[in-house]
Amino acid sequence: MSGAVGLVVKRRSGIAEDVARLVVKELVESGVEVLVDETVDYPSLSGFPRFSISRDPPGRVVVVGGDGTLLRTFLRLGERESPLFMTIKAGKKGFLLDVERYEAVERLRDFLEGRFREVVYPRYRVYLEGEARACMFNDTAVTANNAKMARVHVFVDGDLAMNIDGDGVVVSTTAGSTAYSLSGGGPIIDPRLDVIVLTPLNPVQLFLRSIVVPSGSRVTVEASVYSNPLVVNIDGQYVYELEPGGIVDIERCGSGVRIARFRWWEDYYERLYTRLLAYW
């Protein structure tokens, strides 16, 4: 594989900066042109040409940081064709990043030489009152504001699936099943499956449980006209208000995200639970 490699790095993190410097050193020694994303502000990386993930991403991009860094990068990408991402964990948890920092150089060499498995992750376009807002990677939560009750109706391809009086609902992808949905009692979805998970949050209707639907479904969340004002949170990054009677539509986005995986399926659940226990 040839061509420049872009670098996106978590901000205000000494660990992420140290890992990024190792990555840059290896790339330079390998004769690869290094481009640094416009959001990176470390003086040690200031001497390299800049790029923007939202305008002109190179064909390959290394992301160093945690889940938040990765999710922000994907949101900034918009609906552009995805570069091939390599992800290096330099955050506290990093469920979505499979390369540990101690193996960063070795895996970077594998990345440059094509020794990996490319996995394409679907994303879902989120509409607020008919206007496209973003393509989510993890989840979209429609929740109550100011600790008041949320009343929402959830539809799948036009059919009513849930009436919820409670804290709201989380609509998650397979990748997002270990995030907010899991905290709300939703299932862990094997990463080899391609589905959408609908998880009610603390419903008064105690019989309500998560529903798993096909990835091609169109999910609609309608705020009841009797509901309090709600909040729509996309991937924990973009937040919007939703008035009573407002509608959120979610459907598959045309462009997925390409990620180079190295040991993603090996000991997956062991690694998953190890990272979950890190919250203890």
From Swiss-Prot:
UniProt-annotated location(s): Cytoplasm
Principal location listed in the UniProt entry: cytoplasm
Cofactor: a divalent metal cation
Keyword Zinc in annotation: no
EC number: 2.7.1.23
Sample GO molecular function, one term: ATP binding
Amino-acid positions noted as binding NAD(+) in the UniProt annotation, renumbered to this chain: 67-68, 72, 138-139, 167, 175, 178-183, 237
Cellular component aspect of the GO annotation: cytoplasm
UniProt record, GO biological process: NAD metabolic process; NADP biosynthetic process
Catalytic site: 67 (proton acceptor)
Leading EC class: transferase
Reaction(s) catalysed (UniProt annotation): NAD(+) + ATP = ADP + NADP(+) + H(+)
Keywords from the named record: ATP-binding, Cytoplasm, Kinase, NAD, NADP, Nucleotide-binding, Transferase
Secretion signal span: none
Function of the protein: Involved in the regulation of the intracellular balance of NAD and NADP, and is a key enzyme in the biosynthesis of NADP. Catalyzes specifically the phosphorylation on 2'-hydroxyl of the adenosine moiety of NAD to yield NADP.
Family note: Belongs to the NAD kinase family.
Protein name as annotated: NAD kinase
Species annotation: Aeropyrum pernix (strain ATCC 700893 / DSM 11879 / JCM 9820 / NBRC 100138 / K1)
